[in-house]
């Protein structure tokens, strides 16, 4: 039975009208004077730290920790500014699905498994009032690889449970093939939602346990069995 539910953020819980991508571009422009840093870059399912390294290397720059520190400080400032003016929201069905999970006889714990850096995740979810709904998370600060972030999330969940969590006691919810892959990396069950850039059929090709248009389309009890 599922004891821990790990949620992706962008494209799964919320949409921000590309606030994060815009903030990335503005930060690269301000810190490194790259004028088209995010053009033709795929963000879906990727990690902030991995993307930053990729973009810097594409511009002939091998990043240092100081580079990351300067970049992400600027990115977070831009993110807060942009979120305040671009709108966005929580996807339909998210609140009801989480409420349904909380109402189950054996209520699972909620965590985050995301490619955002921790402070970026906090800014985004606080903006929509749901940061407090998650006990803990694993983030791009922990590793550049999403599969490794999943392992961190499993370890932190186990620590909170006071015992090792088996993979099949964990449910990973995400909107990209990379979310499915990272769930499989820890032996978790995977619920793929087509609220991001991929259709239900595209997600099904990667063989999640469930693939739905939105979290409104699946009873919470079904995924906890």
Where are these regions (language model features)?
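Active-site neighborhood of HAD-like aspartate-dependent phosphohydrolases
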Residues: 1-44, 50, 56-58, 200
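Asp-based, Mg2+/Mn2+-dependent phosphohydrolase catalytic module
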Residues: 1-3, 63-66, 95, 99-102, ...
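Membrane-embedded alpha-helical bundles of multi-pass transporters/translocases
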Residues: 4, 75-76
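Short, acidic loop-to-helix structural element flanking the phosphoryl-transfer center
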Residues: 6, 80-112, 118, 134
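Phosphate/oxyanion-binding active-site loops and adjacent basic polyanion-contact surfaces
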Residues: 16, 20, 90, 143-149
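Active-site nucleophile and cofactor-binding loops and adjacent substrate-binding regions
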Residues: 40-45, 114, 141-142
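Helix-loop "lid/cap" segments that line or gate small-molecule binding pockets
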Residues: 49-63, 153-155
